[in-house]
């Protein structure tokens, strides 16, 4: 379960952000997770509860914002949903796309104290 290592990194980084701001305990952490990032949100929530114990995030909640995978077709300038499993074929012109615009994100976007 690689979500545990991801959750541990989130706890460490959120704690560093809070300390840098001179804050104590963290009440919530918001993360953006792309549809193709390979992260299961439920598993990440569970792992976060384990990783936060004994830290400044012990009572913090994790807010996961899921980002849909979107591709861009250079042939017809269409942006389209890739879906899961991913399908990189333009529904408008029926050609393959080679540009993924979103869906691989895994980033902390907010830390509330």
Question: What does each of the following model-derived ranges do?
Answer:
Residues 1, 77-78:
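Intrinsically disordered, low-complexity, mixed-charge
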Residues 1-63:
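Long, charged N-terminal interaction/targeting segments
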Residues 33, 66, 110:
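Flexible glycine-/small-residue-rich
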Residues 65-67, 75-76:
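STAS-like cytosolic regulatory interaction modules
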Residues 66-69, 86, 104:
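Short metal-coordination and nucleic-acid-contact micro-motifs, chiefly zinc-binding Cys/His arrays
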Residues 73-76, 90-93:
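Short cysteine-rich clusters marking metal-coordination/redox-active sites
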Residues 79-80, 97:
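Cys/His-rich microdomains that often coordinate metals
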Residues 92-113:
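Short microdomains enriched in Cys/His and/or Lys/Arg
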């Amino acid at each position: 379960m690689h979500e545990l290592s991801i959750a541990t990194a989130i706890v460490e980084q959120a704690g560093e952000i809070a300390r840098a701001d001179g804050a104590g305990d963290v009440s919530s952490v918001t993360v953006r997770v792309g549809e193709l990032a390979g992260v299961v949100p439920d598993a990440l929530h569970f792992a976060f509860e384990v990783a936060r114990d004994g830290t400044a995030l012990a009572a913090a909640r994790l807010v996961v914002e899921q980002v849909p995978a979107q591709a861009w077709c250079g042939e017809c300038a269409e942006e389209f949903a890739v879906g899961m499993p991913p399908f990189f074929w333009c529904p408008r012109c029926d050609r393959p796309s080679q540009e993924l615009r979103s869906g691989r994100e895994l980033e902390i976007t907010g830390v509330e104290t």
